[in-house]
Amino acid sequence: MPTGITIGCNKRFALGVNYAWRNFSADFGGLATWSIQGVSAAPAGYAADLAAMKAAGASVIRWWVFPDFRSDGVQFDANDDPTGLSASALADMAKALELAQTAGVYLVPTIFSFDAFRPKQTTENVTVRSIAPLVKAPARRAKLVANVVTPLAKAAAASPHRARLLGWDLINEPEWAIAVSGQNSQDFTPNEELTAVSLAEMKALITEMMGVLKTETPAAFTSVGWAAAKWSWAFTDLALDVNQPHIYGWVNQYWPYTRKPAELGYPATRPTIMGEFFLQSMPFSDSNANDTFAVIMESWWTNGYAGAWPWHHRENAANLPLIKTFADAKGCQAKP
């Protein structure tokens, strides 16, 4: 393990797992219309989940915050511009860090996701606004950063348990919401259900978020959960602290897990963590590959990756022993 992430004052392989949520897009802020409580209102279930992940050897938890805007966490005005975070969302961030302290784990909150780029819709009496118009317009994007990202970061920084904030994942798989750019033969293929923005607009969002997060929480690393190495060419100029690519069967067919980070297009000047891959005995079986979890993890360990977070606890909790086997074999190099 020639590289790693500093965890608990020592450089370690950042072994973790995607939570990624207990209630999709409602863990932070809750969703009263659907009778869903956030972390601070119903901490027992979240605490039990974190304890189970820790017991399985996971020390880093990737946890989604606002993958879309269905929750009561983000407040909006009549123009659908964000005006701030609810008291419950701020309390939920504080509680999440407290629970992380109790469980002995570190958090990497994922602030946004490509899911939020769906057009505005109303589902079961809940209006879910779209992030796309906010990203497209510089003035509205500034409100998004000032009124959502900034207070979230300030809440984390104000926590007495802020040391449990290991890093940030600014946005999950933004490539699915980027329009064809004409800049590379490996161009974007946006999800047809989403309202795509330009590459420049997406990079502006990421850059503006980075500025706030590094100011408010300077000890926490910044990353983006990249959908695939196919699009690594587009983001090498972003000054993120950690590369965080994702890999599933379709990616592995063309950009195999056996390659070192630099061979996949990720800058060697910063650590690379595999941020998503299936938590199952053969993670790439969706493309008929029979490589085992243990073999894949050992390859990343050997080839200089700084960590790995399989997907995900909510659906694959029965497979947590796969993580524990690896954690036990590596000892303190993989778990504080």
What are these regions (language model features)?
Residues 46, 206, 257-258, 293:
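Amphipathic coiled-coil/heptad-repeat helices and related helical stalk/stem segments
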Residues 241-257, 279, 333-336:
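Glycan-recognition surfaces
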Residues 258-273, 277-304:
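Surface-exposed substrate-engagement region within the catalytic domains
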Residues 108-117, 261-277, 318-327:
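Short secondary-structure transition/capping segments
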Residues 301-334:
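Aromatic/acidic polysaccharide-binding cleft in carbohydrate-active enzymes
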Residues 1-6, 332-336:
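Low-complexity, Pro/Thr/Ser/Gly/Ala-rich linker/spacer regions in secreted
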Residues 4-240, 246-249, 281-288, 298, ...:
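Active-site mouth of glycoside hydrolases
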Residues 135-142, 326-336:
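Short, basic, helix/turn surface patches
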